[in-house]
Amino acid sequence: MITEDYVSFETAKLLKDKGFDEPCLYYYFSDGRIGKRKGLKDRNCSSVNTFSMPTLQMAMKWLRGVHNIVIVIEPHKYDYINEKNSSYVASLWQGDNYYENITSKDYPTYEETADAAIKYCLENLI
């Protein structure tokens, strides 16, 4: 079964700080607990200490559309015994600028790499 993957709590807080305001079904409370709306809504309210919880792809699409940042995630190492990728790295384009291997380490999953790359963009490029 395919499931959705969401940004981490730390990344959600950074997204709010950088102006992310897209409607999301899920959100984080200030203590990291997860809440769910009955309908889509922007949960980055200034009056309530909640943080919208977008999917990784939604956050990456927002970075592309609003900040012209394209994240590229690639396999870095291959486990020939188990016949699968064993780590991933991320690079990105921002306009004509290319940043190679922006994540400080290899991550074991595509999703962890995506979250780290989004966080890097929010902390260093926006």
Question: What do the predicted segments below correspond to?
Answer:
Residues 13, 17, 21, 30-108, ...:
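N-terminal segment of the canonical double-stranded RNA-binding domain
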Residues 1-3, 7, 13, 17:
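GGW-centered surface loops in extracellular recognition modules
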Residues 4-9, 23-25, 40, 104, ...:
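Catalytic phosphate/metal-binding cores of nucleic-acid and nucleotide-processing enzymes, i.e., regions
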